[in-house]
């Protein structure tokens, strides 16, 4: 099988425009990346959709993403569709992402789920730098595979790392390793019969621990939430489809953004 590995770059820098809303100050991207112009669904909250004109990640693909959210910006970044990791044969596909959230800025990073196909190998590394006044809502959703085809946990390996620093001090680190060759993904300590996994982190967001627990109990998911450093929250949930997890995440995001815009 012939593959054409691609190194892709994305740069995005935002600032507050003349009308007091978040705008793009500078951007640069190489194929398959594209950025839609920001739109404003709610007052001063900007939304930018990240596009990837591609069927998915292949063997040798390497993505380099750098996002710089300017001071006082309120921004939600979404993706175009579910992200597919194809058969990477004897190699892997990777992504390095560096995010900086400025003073008094808010970022809601809300990509669609990641689907590793049979024999897919993916490595993801995300580093997020915050100020003490920055607010962050960051998530990833991982799927067991092409569930509709009953292709469950047939990928090779999936390894994602998330590191969050506040004023240059580490406050959160997540190291997710899913390796079906060495671990039974269906046991009760892993997916336990579920097929979709949500990992959500809230930093300086106006949502309390008990409020988050109530939202989990109301949703059609199996999940829990914990306090991490300085009363920030980490929420993890499992479901048998993407819809319940996306609905829970959207409900949390809606509550958080409503409170932020009132402040």
From Swiss-Prot:
Assembly with partners or alone: UreH, UreF and UreG form a complex that acts as a GTP-hydrolysis-dependent molecular chaperone, activating the urease apoprotein by helping to assemble the nickel containing metallocenter of UreC. The UreE protein probably delivers the nickel.
InterPro entries cross-referenced by the UniProt entry: UreD
Chief site of localization: cytoplasm
Origin: domain of life: Bacteria
Gene Ontology MF term list: nickel cation binding
Disulfide pattern: none
Organism: Helicobacter acinonychis (strain Sheeba)
UniProt name for this protein: Urease accessory protein UreH
HAMAP family named in the record: UreD
This protein's record includes keyword Transmembrane helix: no
Family note: Belongs to the UreD family.
Gene: ureH
GO annotation, cellular component aspect: cytoplasm
Function: Required for maturation of urease via the functional incorporation of the urease nickel metallocenter.
Pfam families: UreD (PF01774)
Places the protein is found: Cytoplasm
Keywords in alphabetical order: Chaperone, Cytoplasm, Nickel insertion
């Amino acid at each position: 099988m012939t593959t054409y590995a691609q190194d892709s770059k994305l740069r995005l820098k935002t600032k507050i425009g003349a009308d007091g809303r978040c705008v793009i100050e500078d951007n640069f991207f190489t194929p398959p990346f594209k950025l839609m112009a920001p739109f404003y669904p709610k007052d001063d909250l900007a939304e930018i959709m990240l596009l990837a004109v591609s069927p998915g990640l292949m063997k040798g693909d390497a993505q380099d993403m750098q996002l710089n959210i300017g001071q006082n910006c309120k921004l939600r970044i979404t993706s175009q569709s579910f992200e597919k990791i194809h058969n990477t044969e004897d190699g892997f596909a990777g992504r390095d992402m560096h995010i900086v959230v400025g003073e008094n800025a808010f970022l809601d990073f809300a990509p669609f789920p990641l689907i590793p196909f049979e024999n897919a190998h993916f490595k993801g590394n995300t580093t997020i730098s915050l100020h003490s006044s920055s607010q962050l809502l960051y998530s990833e959703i991982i799927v067991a595979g092409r569930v509709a085809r009953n292709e469950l946990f047939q990928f090779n390996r999936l390894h994602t790392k998330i590191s969050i620093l506040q004023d240059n001090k580490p406050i959160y680190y997540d190291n997710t390793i899913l390796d079906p060759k060495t671990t039974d993904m269906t046991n009760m300590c892993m997916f336990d019969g579920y097929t979709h996994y949500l990992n959500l982190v809230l930093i300086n967001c106006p949502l309390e621990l008990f409020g988050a627990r109530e939202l989990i109990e109301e949703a059609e998911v199996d999940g829990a939430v914990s306090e991490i450093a300085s009363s920030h929250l980490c929420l993890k949930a499992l479901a048998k489809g993407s819809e319940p997890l996306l609905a829970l995440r959207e409900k949390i995001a809606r509550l958080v953004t409503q409170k932020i815009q009132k402040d």
